[in-house]
């Protein structure tokens, strides 16, 4: 993780105390301490001028977890490894306390220090969980716009663990959770199902079953949209028919069915489903496609009425102007067609549209 970007304040929070005459601890390197703890040491000095060992230990772990290139980080890492068992136990306590205080940055610093010292898969997972905490805190500020690099690193770390241990339930489950948060429903379902297969814990299995149930329907809708995109209309219909409860957005199911039937040339069913979809949403894409299906069925006046509804509510819908212009052209209402093509051209120009403008201008003059 880019500590200088996400943990910049910590670089100024660390101070160093020089030891007299080379010092007897830490091989003579300066003693680290957080600035707040230095103040505490001054206000509450220990017996015979001794420093609080926990203050020193905390600062060493912060330095190690913050940046391996930080001054004396290697010295502190070496010292902590010499006392590995006690260090790991103490770090676990600090991680727990930081988590209880919702201090995501300290959780990360201590978890990352633990990863650097030992580096087990469990340590790497805990660091990545902590990175998620930092990402989530940033997301509240700008919906993740400034943290895409962090999210990518989080996903890469989970994927790397899965490469090394394909049956790692925790990593599979975590990656499923990340994809679910990003509305990548198919991938979320895939990783949850893999985690379910690998888990031996009944409690986790039940949690995963609930997660799969949550993403199953949006995953089916996403899959149907993919089939639709590639012109595989029968598969799109089959997939969407597996959605029993019509999800929380029945308009999406109706829209997919309508477009699939349109692709198959069944315009009557296409109109029925697209009309149903239009009852749930007035989105321009849905209404434009509904109008096209009406026109394909020969109901051009109804199609024009739908397109008119669009442009009256959204004067920047270029597609609706073009579509209505084409229908006016087919009805030999060249003045109306010319007006719509000009409106579309003002929103976004292209050569083909300009040719239609010139053509309808001439035809309108002959009317």
Language-model region placement:
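Canonical tetratricopeptide repeat
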Residues: 126, 174, 207-208, 256, ...
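Helix-start (N-cap) detector for alpha-helical repeat units in TPR-like alpha-solenoids
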Residues: 88, 121-122, 169-170, 202-203, ...
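Register position in tetratricopeptide repeats
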Residues: 100, 133, 181, 214, ...
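Alpha-helical adaptor scaffolds
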Residues: 125-152, 251-313
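Structural marker of alpha-solenoid helical repeat scaffolds
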Residues: 116-117, 164, 198, 246, ...
